[in-house]
From Swiss-Prot:
PROSITE patterns: CLPX_ZB (PS51902). Transmembrane segments: none annotated. Belongs to the ClpX chaperone family. This is ATP-dependent Clp protease ATP-binding subunit ClpX. It comes from Nitrobacter hamburgensis (strain DSM 10229 / NCIMB 13809 / X14).
């Protein structure tokens, strides 16, 4: 175990595993009753690493197909078929890349980071959140609006890798195979065409900082709980195999695309549509890298996002489905709230259409549906806990339009409170 020998060597310490003396190794670590040398520690780490790799290969043998991923997305996200296909294929290929790199070393497969462009409330963030539910790799979301260059007030880009590491329970091997979604990426566009006016610490500066981690670098991340000791070493995370998905509304990009379209077709045969005559999602379909450069993204940043997926505007039919079809649909959520009061909440089909039209008029997409429902049901939710005998509340189109109040149906059918008089 510990001390062996006679004479001068009686105080010499030996490794309990390989038997080498303290003079033959760089360091000898003492336990309660044993010693282990640095060489045996490294050997143990190599064994653990190999076992982790083999377990990763086994876990990725059943790679989910793009159709399987898309099917799960369909359960939560209505419409956006093209964007779902792009994301499903990208995630599937991400799994395949990791599997290929673990097993083979002949051809290096480069990753294809993704840029999601779509109007407000079209489902970009929801797609990313739903992916987080179904993936077997660590996943994190970051907000680009909070990022600044290192050294300035705000979060620096290394914080993104720290969040990914936290989602992997500080397992560096797993974090290096994760997926990062960066929201509001359009907010870090260059603020001015003249870079010499002021230092753009939250725009072009952040783009430059993101370039490194998106392309692949070794980021230094503080260990769990932060650095409590000055000599405590940072964790090194290689970002080469981390897939980055960036999303943004890119408000105003449609004008740049439309302007380019007008300059390319002139003459009597040219068909020119004003931007307001076409839906934003339809215009986004024609986006080119040069449009993103004019918007304020630097060429190097655009080059690191080779896959561009555009999302469509949500029409009335899609918004109605969003209200009722997904597993966590808004109507189902409010019906559950009313069930807690033992009351049934019913929406007429015309009422759902009126709610969808309101969201379209406000140009808020699916994100605006909750605020519309809140305003419609506010008075009802305020009154109901104090009322007795109500078993059903019916919401009609007139209620949504503000010309009537909800219909309360009481348990005693002879006493039906039909509060459908016009509101003052």
């Amino acid at each position: 175990m510990s001390k062996v020998g006679t004479g001068d060597s009686k105080n010499t310490l030996y490794c309990s595993f390989c038997g080498k003396s303290q003079h033959e190794v760089r360091k000898l670590i003492a336990g309660p009753t044993v010693f282990i040398c640095d060489e045996c520690v490294e050997l143990c780490m190599d064994i653990i690493r190999e076992e982790n790799k083999s377990s990763l290969v086994k876990s990725r043998d059943g790679i989910p197909t793009p159709k399987e991923i898309c099917k799960v997305l369909d359960d939560y996200v209505i419409g956006q078929g093209h964007a779902k296909k792009v994301l499903s294929v990208a995630v599937h290929n991400h799994y395949k890349r990791l599997n290929h790199q673990t097993k083979h070393n002949d051809v290096e497969l480069a990753k294809s980071n993704i840029l999601l462009i779509g109007p407000t409330g079209s489902g970009k963030t929801l797609l990313a959140q739903t992916l987080a539910r179904i993936l077997d790799v660590p996943f994190t979301m970051a907000d680009a609006t909070t990022l600044t260059e290192a050294g300035y007030v705000g979060e620096d880009v290394e914080n993104i890798i720290l969040k990914l590491l936290q989602s992997a329970d500080y397992n560096v091997e797993r974090a290096q195979r994760g997926i990062v979604y960066i929201d509001e990426i359009d907010k870090i566009s260059r603020k001015s065409d003249n870079p010499s006016i002021t230092r753009d610490v939250s725009g072009e500066g952040v783009q430059q900082a993101l370039l490194k981690i998106m392309e692949g670098t070794v980021a230094s991340v503080p260990p769990q709980g932060g650095r409590k000791h000055p000599q405590q070493e940072f964790l090194q995370v290689d970002t080469t195999n981390i897939l980055f998905i960036c999303g943004g509304a890119f408000s105003g990009l449609e004008k740049i695309i439309s302007a380019r379209g007008r300059t390319t077709s002139i003459g009597f045969a040219a068909q020119v549509l004003a931007p307001e005559d076409r839906r934003t999602g339809e215009i986004f379909r024609h986006v080119e890298p040069e449009d993103l450069l004019k918007y304020g993204l630097i060429p190097e940043f655009v080059g690191r996002l080779p896959v561009v997926a555009t999302l469509e505007d949500l029409d009335e039919a899609s918004l109605k489905k969003i209200l009722t079809d997904p597993k966590n649909a808004l109507v189902k959520q409010y019906q559950r709230l009313f069930e807690m009061e033992n009351i049934e909440l019913t929406f007429a089909d015309e009422a759902l259409g009126a709610i969808a039209r309101k969201a379209i008029e406000r140009k808020t997409g699916a994100r605006g549906l909750r605020s519309i429902l809140e305003s419609i049901l506010l008075e009802t939710m305020f009154d109901l806990p104090g009322l007795e005998g109500v078993e059903e509340v019916v919401i009609s189109r007139e209620v949504v339009e503000g010309t009537a109040r909800p219909l309360y149906i009481y348990a005693d059918r002879s006493d039906r409170a039909s509060e459908t008089s016009a509101s003052a």
